[in-house]
From Swiss-Prot:
Residues 1-23 form the signal peptide. The keyword Transport applies. It is found in: Cell outer membrane. InterPro entries: Gram-neg_bact_OMP, Gram_neg_porin_domain, Porin_dom_sf, Porin_Gram-ve, Porin_Neis. GO terms for cellular component: cell outer membrane; pore complex. This is Chitoporin. Involved in the uptake of chitosugars. Disulfide bonds: none annotated. It comes from Vibrio furnissii. The gene is chiP. Belongs to the Gram-negative porin family. The lineage of its organism: Bacteria, Pseudomonadati, Pseudomonadota, Gammaproteobacteria, Vibrionales. It holds the Pfam family Porin_4.
Amino acid sequence: MDKMFKRTVIGAAVALASTGLMAKEVGVNSDFNVDVYGVAAMSVVNYNTTDNRDDSSGYVLENESRIGFRAHKEMFENFTVTMQIESGYVDSTDWGHGGVSGGVLGFRDTYIGASGDWGNVRVGRVLTPLYEIVDWPFSNPGLGAAFDWGGINAHYDRQSNQIRYDSPKFGGFSFAASVGRDDNDNGGGAATRDANFFGANARYSFEKITLLGAVESGTRVVAETGGDWELDNTGTAVQNPVVAGYDDDTFAYLVGFEASLPAGFGLAAAFKGEELDNGIRKHKQDSFSIVGQYWNGPLGIKIGYAANLDSKIDGVKQDDANNILSGQVMGVINGFVPYVRVAARSDFTSDKDTDIVTRVGLEYGF
């Protein structure tokens, strides 16, 4: 549950740090609301419990806690302006020794937006419409290495240079659409020349069933590499070969459903197709995900299976299929969610074996 507080303290601090004249010039206000929200999440995980290939790093702590701030105020009738900034996962980063800055504010959804009964517009860093559905409900519990970021990955996830519109509900129907330009690693803020994408999703709910569909298309620019100079073993300067850059046209789509079944059961399934085409080679791969769950009061059981099928390059099948079978037992105790998850990840290495992933954790949303 979001906790609300008036921005009087923040406004006062800004006013004290400024002259009275400057405060008036920048328009410091103290009459809008700020929501503070987040997730406290800690788990103990081993990604290779059976130590296949002598490749287990043992059990480690994963801190997936995050926090966000959302300020909002009605600018005029039926037009509410919202600013949100949200951190990434804290992880167990050693900041002093070059740790990845995933826990910084602005790493997750961070935007300026406006909303009313006409819908919601967000400008900044948000999920793409397709990835929103890929992520939930079809990548949980623990299916992301296959259905989310696994495979040839011809879709984006969260992008910075993006404008997204979400419609209101028209009966049981709603949709979202976005355009963007970002193509940096990890969705960084600097766009690449000629890189762009657009996407959309749609949902239709009736009775206890929701149908979902999404599509995304874009152009990724892969830069030229090589051409640098180095000394060979005789001390002679030689130039490394130049590998030409290229543009990858991307395309991805998803169709799926969620169903709430009698007696506490639920079922969700989706099929996803992806394609990369640079004009010289065409790389295609299909994936699917099936998730079932059962709830009896505060106790829940969730079982999921996701797989990437063998991809094809110019119609030739590749030997790169993999899959995950995952099960999770969880409870809800006064808002806290303790859980145990065991997953079998198969064919993710050249040995074509199965790694057993075990995780025990606790989460609490606020």
